[in-house]
Structure formats: C-alpha cells, structure tokens
Amino acid sequence: MTQTLPTPRGSLTPNRTLADLTWLRVGGPADWLFQPADEADLAAFLAALDPAIPVFPMGVGSNLIVRDGGIRGVVIRLGRGFNAIACEGGTVTAGAAALDAHVARRAAEAGLDLTFLRTIPGSIGGAVRMNAGCYGTYVADHLVSVRAVARDGSLHEIAAADLRFGYRHSDLPEGWVVIEARFRAEPGDPAELAARMEEQLARRDASQPTKDRSAGSTFRNPAGYSSTGRADDSHELKAWTLIDAAGLRGHRLGGAQMSEKHPNFLLNAGGATAAELEALGELVRRKVRETSGHELKWEVIRVGRP
C-alpha cells in the first residue's frame, strides 16, 4: 500500500502480521494496523483518511479467520483507551475493547446481572456487532445504546432499537467502529451472581474444547431453530448435531480439525493455514447439505485475501 496516511497519536504499523492477534493464530498481514490512542485520535484519523481506503475494525480476534493473503487497507484495533467499565444505578457502560468476561465480573461485583457475558469470548465491540449471546440471553436483551465513530470520523450515539438486532446480526454500518456500549442490568446478589458464573464456566468447559485453539462456534444454528429471543427460540436443532450426523466429528484436513469434543468447533490442531481452516469448513457445509438438506451458515467471520 503506497498511499500516504494521516499521522495519528496512536500507533500505525505497516505490513503488520495479524496471525498473533487472532485466536486461531493464522492469517497474513494488514496493509496497516492502527491502534488509536483515544476516541479523538480515532475520529481525527478516520476523518483524514482517504475514503477509498477500506477499514476493518478488529477486536481480539476470537471469532475470526484472517485469510493467508492478509487484509487490504487499515485494520483498526482498540486498546487501553477504550476498555473502561463503569457501573451506575442499573446500567453498565463499557468501552468496546473491554473483554466480555471482565464486564460480567465487574457488573456482578456491583450487584448487576450481566452474567450471560461471562462465557462469551471476545470484547464488547464485537459482541455488539454480532449480537453475541449465551444460554438464551443476547446483547439485544440488555443493550441501551452504543457510541460509534463512522467511516468519515463523525461520532454517533445509536439506540439499540436502531441496530435492528437479529440472530448473530446487527445493522451497524460497515466501517463504523463501536467505541462504547451501555447496558441495562437487573440487580442481584454479588455472591449469587459469582456462583452462577462459575457454574456457567464449568458447563462450558465440560462441553466445549476450551483448551484448544479455536474461534468459538463455527456455524450458526439453522434458521428457524436458532435462539433469537423471539418465537423461534426452540433450540430443537443445533449445527453440531448435523455435523455429527454427517460423520465429521474429529474430521481433519491438514492442520485443521473439527473438534472431537464439540463438532461445531473448528480447531487449529497444529500448523494450520487459514486456507485449510476455511476449506474444512466448506467441506463440512457441503457434507451437511448432502446428508440433511440444511445449509449451514458461517458464524466465524472470514476476511481478507486468499
């Protein structure tokens, strides 16, 4: 990338490999990696950046495959200036870089129930963008509003209703960067909330490959059977049962593998490339389609050049 970019107060690194910033440890470099110092730095940089240059907001890489050819343009990764957590009254305000688990714990200490966030990997910005959820509770159930910086550097406050949440979906425009989210939370006893989170962690560890290198659930549950908080919240059919029925539990392609413990988890079992991970995922989709007629949709975000 040869364009001249604005000079920020934060860090701007050319040709920065991204593999070490993703949970799967795969992927090529970003043309540029921008880590803004604070909100004003982010807004000024985007306002001055050539509109033709693409931007990709990246969280902690917990639900992401960066392809081996890397990402064009500027990857934006928020850090310390965006991880504050404040609890006041019945609300919790969290910076987009705050980890979901940290927000859940801080809220519980303040006697506020956001326990559903405890077992969700990743940070608040990504959780808002994809309406993350666990055990039948979703970001959409608690979100009041978000603050975000648009691609042109303008600052916006968006009510939760305007994000039009669906299953693993929000209408947040491409290139907009969430910087803060405000949640409503019911009161609860801190000790009881802490105990509930410990139970959730034990339940997760018993059923998911939490010690392996994965990006969480690979595929969405089939439409009409997925938990959305609406009438179709039936939980009668899960992606993992379709993968298992297709005989793909533990299936391997190069260094990529579908987990033996939970077949909807795609693993880097050792030395995998992004191409191998994506190819195994597509093989799973094809086999499930052939054996069940269901079309699995990726939940893991795949981005970049092959």
Curated annotation (Swiss-Prot):
GO terms for cellular component: cytosol. Residues 25-188 form the FAD-binding PCMH-type domain. Residues 215-229 have a biased composition (Polar residues). It catalyses: UDP-N-acetyl-alpha-D-muramate + NADP(+) = UDP-N-acetyl-3-O-(1-carboxyvinyl)-alpha-D-glucosamine + NADPH + H(+). Keywords: Cell cycle, Cell division, Cell shape, Cell wall biogenesis/degradation, Cytoplasm, FAD, Flavoprotein, NADP, Oxidoreductase, Peptidoglycan synthesis. Residues 199-214 have a biased composition (Basic and acidic residues). Its cofactor is FAD. Belongs to the MurB family. This is UDP-N-acetylenolpyruvoylglucosamine reductase. It comes from Paracoccus denitrificans (strain Pd 1222). The lineage of its organism: Bacteria, Pseudomonadati, Pseudomonadota, Alphaproteobacteria, Rhodobacterales. The gene is murB.
